[in-house]
């Protein structure tokens, strides 16, 4: 009986420890950040050019910092949201009814922002990891998206 309690306690503690590690590590794996050698505007333009050259559309570039200020939130350093869409990838995911909820992650967004140090940074979601959480078609498509998006921002590596 004592051995069973010890095994059960070890299992529970191991599960809790694993949960704590995953909880603390996942944000760093899901969201990526890198320093850009260019200004905010130059970085946005490079990303747009690279995406378009690879068959992606750029539906919009939104100056989030201006919207925050306009609506009374105060002044923050520049934050630009570059919205990107590859129509075939979007179709392959959204043509399946069970995947329509994935539309909350669309269009793909790369952020370009300036921190208080005056430097420009690029932020993006790890599309491959996101896709693997859903499996199936979403995982297949998002694996491709991940590779393609890295090519848009390779100048900052």
Residue ranges and their predicted role:
Residues 1-2:
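N-terminal hydrophobic targeting signals that begin at the initiator methionine
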Residues 6-24:
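Hydrophobic membrane-insertion alpha-helices, especially the h-region
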Residues 19-62, 67:
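Terminal, regulation- and interaction-focused segments at domain boundaries
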Residues 101-114, 153-157:
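Short secondary-structure transition/capping segments
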């Amino acid at each position: 009986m004592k051995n069973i309690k010890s095994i059960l306690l070890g299992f529970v503690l191991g599960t809790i420890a694993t949960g704590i590690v995953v909880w603390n590590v996942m944000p760093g794996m899901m969201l990526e950040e890198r320093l850009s050698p260019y200004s905010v505007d130059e970085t946005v333009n490079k990303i747009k050019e690279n995406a378009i050259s690879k068959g992606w559309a750029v539906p919009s570039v939104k100056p989030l910092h201006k919207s925050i200020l306009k609506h009374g939130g105060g002044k923050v350093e520049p934050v630009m949201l570059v919205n990107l869409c590859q129509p075939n990838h979007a179709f392959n995911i959204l043509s399946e009814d069970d995947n329509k909820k994935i539309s909350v992650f669309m269009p793909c967004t790369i952020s370009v922002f300036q921190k208080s140090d005056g430097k420009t940074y690029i932020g993006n979601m790890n599309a491959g990891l996101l896709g693997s959480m859903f499996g199936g078609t979403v995982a297949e498509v998002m694996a491709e998206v991940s590779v393609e998006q890295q090519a848009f921002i390779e100048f900052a590596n």
